Amino acid sequence: RVEVPAVELDKAKEYTICIRPIIIRKAYFSKTKKVLEKTYKFYPVPESNIRAYHIADAHNNIEEPIKAAETFGDIDFLILNGDVIEDSSNPKNFMNIYEICSRLTKGERPVIFSRGNHDLRGNFAEKFADYTPTHKGNTYYNFRIGSIWGILLDCGEDKNDNHEEYGHTVACHIFRERQTDF
């Protein structure tokens, strides 16, 4: 994971992603391919007349939210506000988040992402932060894009932790208390 300060990205107006595919990973003398690079333009959020698009509760639907967003034209940033995936039962579901981001921003616009309550359900829920954007592993954070300052809080689930639906697999109350210290 790499975090680039927004102010630096805003100044540079571009960034380059570099990867080196691994053919065989060994303890010694791993085999790799050449480094691949792709440079993206980046458009900072303007100071006024800001256009944002907000998607929530897509539940693994990709085409409908993208088509709806495209009817509004160019955006300055994208907000993905939880439950973009149906649940965390399959790590392939996480790619839906990136598919929507990629198609709507082309890597050129900021994205604000938050976890939803359905994202806490499924075999990979505990690994959610491994697959999605976080700030130092936390799903709550503050941010600044352009003239917008924000704080994103994550309430976790929508019922008490002891609700039978969760089968003793969540501890959101403690998580919410930790955020009050933040």
PLM regions with names:
Residues 1-54:
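Acidic, histidine-bearing metal-coordination/catalytic regions of metal-dependent phosphoesterases
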Residues 20-30, 95-182:
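Extended active-site neighborhood of metal-dependent phosphoesterases/phosphodiesterases
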Residues 31-81, 86-87:
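An acidic-aromatic substrate-binding cleft motif
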Residues 60-63, 92-93, 135:
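Short secondary-structure boundary/capping elements
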Residues 64-69, 93-100:
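A short acidic, amphipathic alpha-helical/loop segment
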Residues 64-65, 89-90, 123-124, 162:
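Short glycine-/acidic-enriched loop or helix-start segments at secondary-structure transitions
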Residues 87-88, 173:
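Short, exposed beta-strand "edge-strand" segments with a Pro/Gly-rich flavor and a Y/T-containing core
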